[in-house]
UniProtKB/Swiss-Prot annotation, chain B:
GO biological process entries: ubiquinone biosynthetic process
Biased composition (Basic and acidic residues): 252-262
Protein name: Ubiquinone biosynthesis protein COQ4, mitochondrial
E.C. designation(s): 4.1.1.130
Reported function: Lyase that catalyzes the C1-decarboxylation of 4-hydroxy-3-methoxy-5-(all-trans-polyprenyl)benzoic acid into 2-methoxy-6-(all-trans-polyprenyl)phenol during ubiquinone biosynthesis.
Extra information: This protein may be expected to contain an N-terminal transit peptide but none has been predicted.
Catalytic class of the enzyme: lyase
A family per Pfam: Coq4
Cofactors (names): Zn(2+)
Gene: COQ4
Chain segments carrying region Disordered: 243-262
Summary of subunit composition and partner proteins: Component of a multi-subunit COQ enzyme complex, composed of at least COQ3, COQ4, COQ5, COQ6, COQ7 and COQ9.
Pathway note: Cofactor biosynthesis; ubiquinone biosynthesis
Length: 465, 262
């Protein structure tokens, strides 16, 4: 029953498309152009793959069209107001920065707004066990763990690098509405845009985020689950300058504070959707107090106070005063930048494959993860690098850039690496979202062990970068 | 070299670390920092002492402290942190003494009120709020207060439930407290001490008092969150209802009835 009605509903749509195709000769002609490569999505992953393709001599002459649904005007004119920082900030690992430097992007990123950090403390909010990473001891003098960079800063740098590149078209405020393959197009993707035009292409790259339309059009499944957790982000002001990152694991999810220049900090508080909504509704003073509580008080305290917002300003200062000063806890947060609080549902999803004939997926389109390891954007950077190299190698040989044979090295390089990382992050999330005393005890032993055994720590650090 | 030690301290705090005494600083004036071994010795020693002489209040108190840490006292504090009144208690940290409670005023309160029931009970048993021992072996100052509060509230639990301080009454109350607070010491007493009962006492304890105590202890609200100083005027029956506690049958009356039957 159900199936037949869906079929009935689907069939006219198919017919309509076919009719529309067959009348293209007589009707006012919708323009169909060709682009060797079409990148859908102007996020960090999409812009990076475009910049990489325009870097290599083998691919620089390939025509590339980048289509972005949103407007890029804000990004292009985004200027350095040192009294404001964006709420979407990512920690770029040294290897991401290394590649961005190589393809000429990093020099366009505003470095006054990037904060390097060399020290990181993670601790268990239930047992207090902690692990500390210090790169000066581990990776040698002068190495950084990561670089806190606003997503806007990175995207702005990427756009600057892409400005005036040959054979590159950036279409913003344009939506990809469908993808078709017809015999006339030799089964290559025809990308239908909201401006009425169609682009035929040899390689369609989906860098179109977690709900990737390209993935859907290509019939690639993405499997995983909802964490039933929201990531609340905010830009906060700290009492003094910091060069350290902190993460405390609470039963509701981890809360992380990462340093930005000029006494700013980037907050990512993963918690229940309900609590995230409550936290967004607090007054700025209450919110600041709650963030300080979340780094210092017991989980019970935090949950009680969020449920009783009118007691935050009366009860919380007393509870905080009872805590003896703990050097591992970040310095007090003194303010929250207005309109900087936002929250995102967190999901763990992995596409069954990253490639199909004439199609490749990169970034969040291929995988999404919990932000607790700060790896989401970095994984996309790794994808872009690997895919660009695969395309370059094929172009150098004069091979078809869209064939699965060309794309396979990319999949082989990234899929299992990403899969392992997604798994580890997923297990960490599960391990730390329980209050079971036995599990708390065991995981604390684990964390203490990690903290005291140098080789284990070295291994983890080398995995993280 | 040597510090002057308050006369009341059981084990003199030594600055140097020994097998039993920890060398970490005191968290509050009466605090006696112990090592894990010290804590174990204290628990075993006071446990034996209590088993043979449960009237040694100091030993009972010590056993309670030695077994509450590190886990259970935090759980009890957590119960307080989940409740607005419990949090206020932690903030204000009121102490109960014969002065702070003004026993004469309580004697003039209306019959059946918490204050009146409490003072009548004190008078009947010949005890005073000042006989409660000071907490010294709990390391966290706030948890030490939780232990102190629990101890000082104990006499109110008697008033609330109407259980007398004879062995079975005391034990039934311990069972009630164990179910309600989760502190292991009360649980220990609840299962070990009946070994010393006469058969008739044991039967009464297991048939009537223990079931009452466990049932009511588990289902009632946490009694640690009652701000006793603020409910003195309240009717005991009403407070029992608020907390979800039934009154147990009068133990002494039952003893008399049984004696008559013989
Ligand atoms: C709370 C939170 C904190 C995070 N912290 C970190 C961190 O510290 N470190 C880190 O590495 N990562 C972090 N991440 C992850 C990181 O933000 C993402 O992985 C990254 O933004 C993904 O980039 P992307 O380019 O793949 O996708 P997106 O940034 O989602 O870009 C996709 C783009 O495609 C466009 N698009 C979609 N559909 C269409 C269509 N039909 N037509 C045209 N355009 C379309 C969208 O408009 C969008 O601009 C965090 C994520 C969250 C939620």
């Amino acid at each position: 029953m159900l199936r037949s009605t869906t079929l009935q509903r689907l069939r006219p749509a198919v017919f309509r498309v076919q009719r529309w195709n067959s009348t293209t000769t007589s009707a006012p002609k919708p323009s169909t152009t060709h682009s060797d490569i079409v990148v859908v999505g102007g996020g960090p992953a999409g812009l990076t793959i475009a910049a990489a393709l325009k870097h290599y001599p083998e691919t620089v002459n390939k025509s590339v069209t980048l289509v972005e649904f949103g407007s890029l005007d804000n990004l292009k004119t985004w200027g350095p107001d040192m009294e404001r920082f964006e709420n979407r900030v990512s920690s770029l690992t040294p290897s991401s920065v290394e590649y961005l430097t190589k393809i000429g992007v990093w020099e366009h990123v505003n470095r006054d707004r990037v904060q390097a950090y060399r020290h990181m403390t993670a601790w268990d909010g239930v047992s207090g066990s902690k692990v500390q990473f210090n790169t000066t001891q581990l990776m040698g003098e002068g190495r950084d763990i990561a670089y806190m960079t606003e997503n806007f800063n990175l995207q702005n740098g990427l756009l600057k690098q892409l400005a005036n590149k040959p054979n590159l078209t950036i279409l913003d405020k344009t939506k990809v509405e469908g993808v078709e393959r017809t015999p006339e197009s030799h089964n290559k993707p025809l990308v239908k845009l909201s401006n009425g035009s169609t682009i035929s292409t040899d390689l369609l790259i989906g860098a179109d985020g977690a709900n990737s339309p390209v993935r859907t059009f290509s019939g690639i499944e993405a499997r995983g689950w909802d964490y039933n957790t929201h990531g609340l982000v905010a830009t906060v002001r700290l009492a003094n300058e910091q060069q350290s990152a902190w993460q405390r694991f609470l039963p509701t999810g981890p809360i992380a504070l990462l340093p930005l220049p000029n006494r700013f900090g980037s907050l990512v508080w993963s918690t229940t959707p309900k609590m995230a909504a409550q936290l967004k509704q607090l007054t700025p003073e209450q919110f600041v107090m709650m963030v300080n509580c979340a780094f210092n008080l017991e989980p019970t305290d935090i949950e009680y106070l969020v449920e009783h917002p009118d007691e935050i300003m009366t009860d919380a200062p007393y509870r905080l005063s009872q805590r003896s000063s703990n050097p591992d806890v970040p310095c007090p947060i003194v303010a929250v930048q207005d309109k900087s609080r936002a929250s995102f549902p967190l999901k763990m999803k992995h596409a069954d494959t990253y490639i199909a004939e004439n199609v490749a997926l990169v970034g969040d389109a291929a995988h999404t993860t919990h932000p607790l390891a700060g790896q989401g954007l970095n994984m996309g950077q790794g994808d872009a690098q690997s895919l660009a190299i695969a395309i370059r190698n094929a172009a150098g040989r004069g091979a078809d850039i869209g064939s699965t044979l060309t794309l396979e090295p990319y999949w082989a390089d990234q899929y299992f690496k990403n899969h392992k990382l997604l798994g580890v992050v997923d297990k960490l999330h599960k391990l730390y979202s329980t209050r079971n005393p036995l599990v708390v005890g065991l995981r604390s032993l684990g964390l203490d062990a990690v903290n005291s055994v140098k080789p284990v720590k070295d291994f983890l650090m080398s995995q993280a970068s | 070299m040597f510090r002057t030690v308050p006369k009341t301290t059981l084990l003199a705090p030594i600055q140097r670390r020994t097998l039993l005494n920890g060398n970490y600083p005191k968290a509050y004036p009466e605090h006696v920092p112990l090592t894990c071994l010290g804590r174990a010795v204290l628990a075993v020693g006071s446990g034996f002492g209590t088993f043979f002489d449960s009237r040694r209040g100091d030993l009972v108190a010590t056993l309670g402290e030695a077994t509450a840490q590190p886990y259970f006292i935090y759980k009890l504090r957590e119960q307080m942190l989940k409740d607005p009144t419990g949090r206020r208690l932690l903030r204000e940290q009121p102490r109960m003494t014969s002065k702070s409670l003004d026993l004469d005023k309580l004697r003039n309160m209306k019959v059946g009120s918490i204050g009146r029931t409490y003072v009548e009970w004190l008078d009947k048993e010949g005890v005073s709020p000042d006989t409660r021992a000071q907490v010294r072996y709990i390391d966290d100052p706030e948890c030490a207060y939780v232990m102190q509060r629990y101890r000082e509230s104990h006499d109110f639990y008697h008033a609330l439930t109407g259980l007398p301080i004879i062995m079975e009454g005391e034990l039934a109350l311990k069972a009630f407290e164990w179910a309600n607070t989760g502190l292991p010491m009360s649980g220990l007493g609840m299962v070990l001490t009946p070994l010393k009962f006469k058969p008739k006492q044991r039967k009464r304890y297991f048939d009537v008092y223990l079931p009452w105590a466990l049932y009511n202890g588990f289902r009632s609200k946490p009694v640690i969150n009652v701000y006793w100083e603020e409910v003195l005027e309240k009717d005991a029956e009403e407070l029992r209802r608020d907390l979800g506690i039934e009154q147990p049958p009068d133990l002494r009356q039952m003893k008399k009835d049984m004696a008559k039957k013989k």
